[in-house]
Amino acid sequence: MLSNRARLALTDIRDNIRLAEQFASGLSVEALRADRRTFYAVTRCLEIISEAARRLPQNLRNRHSELPWRAIMGAGNVYRHDYDNVAEEIVWRTVQNNLAPLLAAVERELARAPKNNEGYHKP
């Protein structure tokens, strides 16, 4: 059974992937570089995704061993502590190429969880 903590982490990952994709939609890497507000918003989404991934139980991460969990969880440290070296191109490529497989895994986990005690915590 999925714990409430894990369910909340999964919903945070799902919601922030959707936001990052929405914010970066239609932008080239050059446009993202020029739009500091969007760059900061997308980077914050990636930071939340990283932190929420740390809250997932190991057995859940093991079910999705195709995902680079260590890199996902470690990315947040870069966004928080090495923020002056976060490259727009890497953020853009992450949104364009790496979030879809994570979103698919998260949605599978949420779909397999019982619906009766869904602990969604945001409007």
Q: Which role fits each region the language model picked out?
A:
Residues 1-123:
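Solvent-exposed interaction patches of small proteins and small membrane subunits
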